[in-house]
Structures are given as structure tokens and as C-alpha cells.
């Protein structure tokens, strides 16, 4: 879960690399480093912590090299410190790496036997010494080919050589890597987002490929060293400006943007004239699909779980939901009439991509729901449904989660209608209600003051629980995850009906418990479960929707009301106060809300 950048140019590159690393910090921010090459001398600087600290380093300010590589790190092997920060170097070779080398211990033993001395605790350093060892007898290209064949695991690499003053080598297996093209300079980066400020012309390396980048041309090779021709893709535009504006944090801005991003997504999929949902170029006949498997990680998994309830409520399709890291290692019974849907904000989630690759190897029907349409998951899927929510910078997903749920719900309505699971009138009624969603979310955002007031009870607690039934259960899971991610408070989401089967033992006097009890078919049962935790001393924060009827329950600590809507849309509205709760809890504790500890936005390692 690191980010790499490389630039071969005819002018100094250090400031451009630093700016690109700032855009890659969503991939990791434990440490950062840069190396540039000029007149046969490699200048290198590293820092623990953010790129801002690296930028202030006097070595960086004096770098004049026109060839350079940079790195932001999320630690996998070795503690996050300057010694373990990238680049890692020998006398002649400097490497930046995203991924995990699974056989690093074996390779290190071999290299130590050859007299190599290791300085760090990282797996990356074996790559440096392998290349150095093979360069004793082989030319550069041969040494790269031999090195890559020795590595087990995943990697995206940027490599410079003291005695090769005009080039960068890039290579990938399992981790994404892109090449960008500019005037008198070319670029290497973990993804298009890192390169968009410099170019909108990009090529992507496939698994096992490597490239040699110079300022005026780029060559691509397969794992045997044979030349590969690459298409140059022109992205829709250069970098989209995105800053915090008047908000203190990106997350706060992204929460407030949700009415606009939902409206934008609805406009992309719903025809304004006939109110029909348009999913263009859907590649399969609906009669060829009898079941669906939804696959994701973290927040994306929660959106998949939410969609399962919608599919089962509105269609006759059989639906399974799986965590990508579990799906990819099980003995799966692949079915030709099953549609596999992969959900990922970044489109680069390693386990989700591996699950997709497994399905592609078995010639399955694959569809992806992503925010980044140039991503690996999008490129390798048969069909892509973008969520159209714009850049999301905060590590804890907010508007992307809403966008994932929205696109999944739109797909539910379209497939349900095509299968004639409901009539046209019902279909049009549901779309009519859907178009009201942005305004409903906008109105629900006004609950801010009460959420701010209750958040202190969560920051002081040893732990908390989030309970829901039916449609509300996936949202309870998401609410608990957000509190864990941002406020570092232990929180668990449970089906409300499961409390008597063990979790009730954890309830103690004063423990905050969030109960999601919208006035749906499960309302009365959920209120009964709420009473059970109140009876054992819990402080219950009830979140329900507005109604003329009062909640008949005593000793509720606080109640937050969201707007009313049909049952399908209530999960969107219940999500908003949970996002705010996590935000204000973290704010009270003074934590870094946009970049919580130990986490990264794009999870590109297993």
C-alpha cells in the first residue's frame, strides 16, 4: 500500500516528484523518500512521516537531477522509520517498491552468502541487491529479467542506476503501474491520479511487464524481454482541482458533497425525459443471468451486503456476498449463469482485483463498480459501472460508499424490471422516489448539532455497539467501521436479533449503543432489542426516521431523526448521522481525520 513516482526529464525533477508524492499520500504516509540522479551522482533524502517533512529537507531543496524516483510508504516489512523508508540503494542501484516480496527471507539468505550487507528490515532491499548481484555478469536488461523471475509476490518498481544517467526502469506484477507521456519528459506512477497533473496521455503495464523510460521515449517488454507495443490512452482531462475549500477536513467536505454527488450519479443513469434507467452496452442477455455474487472489502463489502437485501426484496435473483480476501482463496463453484460484481472505490484493491482475475481465468461474467474508471479493476472487467462521485481524498470513505450503494440500487431496479419482477408502474414509482434522494440527504445533514453533542460519550467509552435489522444491519456495520477508523474506539456492528446469542454479555452500565430502527417492517422487533440493552445499562442513541408516532420506549438517551422515505432509500439516510458521529468523535480527540493511523486509501497489498 505504497505509492511510487518516477520522472525522466531534461530539467530538475525534485519539486515535481514531491508534488506527485503529495497526491499519492492516500496510499501511505508512514514515511517518504526521493532519489535523483545527476552527473553520475545519486542524491537521496528520506523522512519519517508526511511528504511535507521530506519537502523541508535541505538535500531535497538542492537536488538538480533530471532523473528521479519517489515513494510514500505504508509499512508492511519493518517499522515505519527513516531507515526503512524508500528508496533503498546499493552503490549503483536505487529502488522504490509497492507490494510484498513473499520469498524475501530466502533471497536475503542467498544474497548475504554472496557478501551483500543489508541496512533495513524491509523486503524491498532484496530487490536492490539482486539487481546489483546480477549486474556483475549481465547487462541491465538481462539483470532485470533475471531479478523479476526470482521475486515471488507482488510488486510495482521504479529503479534508477548510477551508471545509467538517462533512464528509469519500471516493472509490475500484482501491483498497478502506469506510464505517462509529456513534452521532453516521461513519467512512471502507481496510478493515473499521480500523473494527471503532468499529463493525460497514459499507458498501463500488464502483469509481468517492465519498461525502460527515457525523457524522449519509452520501451515496453514482456517477462522474457520481448518488445511489447502499448496503446496510449487519452484520459478525459488533466487533473481535476480538488481542495478542502472552507472545510477543515476533506472528510467534512465529502460528507457535505453527498447530495450533489448523488444527484450527479442519478443524472448519469436516469433519463430525464422518460425516467428510464440507462445502462448502456450491458453485454449479456438478462435471461443468461440467474444469480449474482457481490464482492468487496471493508466499506465496499458493506455496500455489497446492502445490495443483497435490495436484490432479494425487489428481484427473483439469487444473491451471494463475499469478502474478496476470502473469495479468492476458497474452492469456488463457478457458474456460467452467475454475474460477479466487484466493488472498489479506487479500483486497485489488491484482494478484489485478485478475485476478479480468478473469475476472468474461469471465463466468468464480470462487472465492476468503481470511482476510478482508469483503474485496474475497471480495465479488466467485462463491464464497468462508475459511481460518478468525483475524487475522494479522506481515507474513510463517505460519498463513495453512498455512490456504491446508489449504483447497486440502480442496477437492482434495472435488472428487476428487465426480469419483469415488478411492473412498469412500480418501476417508475421507484425511480420517482429515487430522484428525491439528494434532497432527502441534504435535509438529513441538518442533524449536525445533536450529533456533535453526543459524540463525547463515544470518545470516552471503552467500546460501543451498533445494532440494526434487515436493511439497517449493513449500515450498522458501516457505522461501527467508521468509528473504529477515525476515533480509534472499539466498535462492533451486530444484527439486533443476535444480541441474546453472546454480545449482550458485553453490555455494561453507560456503554453507548447506537440502535438503527427506521419505521420499516423490522421496527417493532428492533425496539424490543433496544429495550434489552437499555435494561442492562446501555446508553442508547436511537436513529430513526421522522414520523407522527412517538417511539414508545423509556430511558432512551438520545434520539436522532432522519428524513422519511420508502424502505429502499432509508439506508442512505441512516448513513449520514453515523458518518457525522465518527467525524466529530475523531475531532474531539484531535486525531488526523483525513489520514487515520495505520490505514491507507488504496489497499494495494494483501
Regions found by a protein language model. Give the residues of each.
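Glycine-rich oxoanion-binding loops at beta->alpha junctions
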Residues: 66-83, 271-284, 307-343, 490-506
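Generic C-terminus detector
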Residues: 539, 565-606
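Active-site phosphate/pyrophosphate-binding segments
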Residues: 258-262, 266-293, 383-512, 586-606
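Conserved short alpha-helical segments that host acidic/polar catalytic motifs at enzyme active sites
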Residues: 1-244, 248, 260-267, 271-290, ...
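Acidic/histidine-rich
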Residues: 154-185, 454, 459-485, 520, ...
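Conserved phosphate/anionic-ligand binding catalytic regions in large, soluble enzymes, centered on
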Residues: 24-33, 98-102, 170-179, 247-251, ...
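Glycine-rich phosphate-binding loops that contact phosphosugars or nucleotide phosphates
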Residues: 287-436, 516-559, 581, 589
Amino acid at each position: 500500500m505504497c505509492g511510487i513516482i518516477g520522472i525522466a526529464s531534461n530539467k530538475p525533477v525534485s519539486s515535481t516528484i514531491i508534488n506527485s508524492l503529495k497526491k499519492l499520500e492516500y496510499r501511505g504516509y508512514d514515511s517518504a523518500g526521493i532519489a535523483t540522479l545527476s552527473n553520475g551522482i545519486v542524491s537521496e533524502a528520506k523522512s519519517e512521516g508526511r511528504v511535507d517533512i521530506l519537502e523541508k529537507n535541505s538535500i531535497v531543496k538542492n537536488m538538480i537531477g533530471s532523473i528521479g524516483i519517489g515513494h510514500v510508504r505504508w509499512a508492511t516489512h519493518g517499522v515505519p522509520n527513516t531507515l526503512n523508508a524508500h528508496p533503498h540503494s546499493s552503490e549503483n542501484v536505487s529502488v522504490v517498491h509497492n507490494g510484498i516480496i513473499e520469498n524475501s527471507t530466502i533471497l536475503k539468505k542467498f544474497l548475504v552468502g554472496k557478501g551483500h550487507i543489508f541496512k533495513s528490515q524491509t523486503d524491498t532491499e532484496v530487490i536492490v541487491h539482486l539487481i546489483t548481484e546480477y549486474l556483475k555478469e549481465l547487462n541491465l536488461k538481462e539483470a532485470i529479467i533475471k531479478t523479476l523471475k526470482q521475486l515471488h509476490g507482488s510488486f510495482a518498481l521504479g529503479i534508477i542506476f548510477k551508471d545509467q544517467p538517462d533512464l528509469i526502469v519500471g516493472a509490475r506484477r500484482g501491483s498497478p503501474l502506469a506510464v505517462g507521456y509529456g513534452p521532453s519528459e516521461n513519467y512512471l506512477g502507481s496510478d493515473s491520479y499521480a500523473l494527471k497533473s503532468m499529463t493525460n496521455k497514459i499507458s498501463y503495464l500488464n502483469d509481468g511487464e517492465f519498461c525502460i523510460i527515457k525523457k524522449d521515449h519509452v520501451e515496453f517488454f514482456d517477462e522474457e524481454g520481448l518488445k511489447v507495443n502499448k496503446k496510449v490512452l487519452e484520459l478525459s482531462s488533466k487533473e481535476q482541482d480538488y481542495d478542502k475549500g472552507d472545510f477543515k477536513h476533506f472528510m467534512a467536505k465529502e460528507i457535505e458533497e453527498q447530495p450533489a454527488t448523488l444527484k450527479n450519479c442519478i443524472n448519469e443513469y436516469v433519463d430525464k425525459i422518460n425516467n428510464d434507467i440507462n445502462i448502456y452496452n450491458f453485454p449479456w442477455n438478462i435471461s443468461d443471468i440467474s444469480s449474482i455474487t457481490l464482492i468487496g472489502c471493508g466499506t465496499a463489502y458493506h455496500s455489497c451486503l446492502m445490495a443483497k437485501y435490495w436484490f432479494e426484496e425487489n428481484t427473483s435473483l439469487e444473491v451471494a456476498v463475499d469478502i474478496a480476501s476470502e473469495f479468492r482463496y476458497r474452492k469456488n463453484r463457478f457458474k456460467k449463469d452467475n454475474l460477479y460484481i466487484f466493488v472498489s472505490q479506487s479500483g486497485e484493491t489488491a484482494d478484489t482485483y485478485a478475485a476478479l482475475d480468478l473469475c476472468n481465468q474461469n471465463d466468468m461474467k464480470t462487472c465492476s463498480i468503481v470511482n476510478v474508471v482508469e483503474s485496474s479493476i475497471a480495465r479488466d472487467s467485462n463491464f464497468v459501472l462508475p459511481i460518478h462521485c468525483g475524487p475522494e481524498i479522506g481515507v474513510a470513505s463517505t460519498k463513495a460508499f453512498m455512490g456504491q450503494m446508489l449504483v447497486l440500487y440502480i442496477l437492482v431496479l434495472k435488472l428487476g424490471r428487465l426480469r419483469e419482477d415488478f411492473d412498469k408502474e412500480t418501476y417508475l414509482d421507484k425511480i420517482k422516489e429515487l430522484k428525491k434522494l439528494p434532497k432527502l440527504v441534504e435535509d438529513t445533514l441538518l442533524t449536525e448539532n445533536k450529533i456533535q453533542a453526543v459524540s463525547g460519550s463515544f470518545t470516552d467509552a471503552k467500546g460501543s455497539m451498533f445494532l440494526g435489522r434487515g436493511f439497517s444491519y449493513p449500515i450498522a456495520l458501516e457505522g461501527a467501521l467508521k468509528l473504529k477508523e477515525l476515533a480509534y474506539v472499539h466498535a462492533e456492528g451486530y444484527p439486533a436479533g443476535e444480541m441474546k446469542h453472546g454480545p449482550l454479555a458485553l453490555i455494561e452500565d453507560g456503554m453507548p449503543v447506537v440502535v438503527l430502527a427506521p419505521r420499516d417492517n423490522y421496527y417493532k422487533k428492533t425496539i424490543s432489542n433496544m429495550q434489552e440493552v437499555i435494561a442492562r445499562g446501555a446508553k442508547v442513541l436511537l436513529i430513526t426516521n421522522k414520523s407522527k408516532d412517538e417511539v414508545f420506549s423509556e430511558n432512551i438517551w438520545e434520539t436522532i431523526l432522519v428524513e422519511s422515505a420508502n424502505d429502499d432509500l432509508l439506508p442512505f439516510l441512516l448513513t449520514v448521522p453515523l458518518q457525522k458521529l465518527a467525524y466529530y468523535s475523531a475531532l474531539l480527540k484531535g486525531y488526523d481525520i483525513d489520514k487515520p493511523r495505520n490505514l491507507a486509501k488504496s489497499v494495494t497489498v494483501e
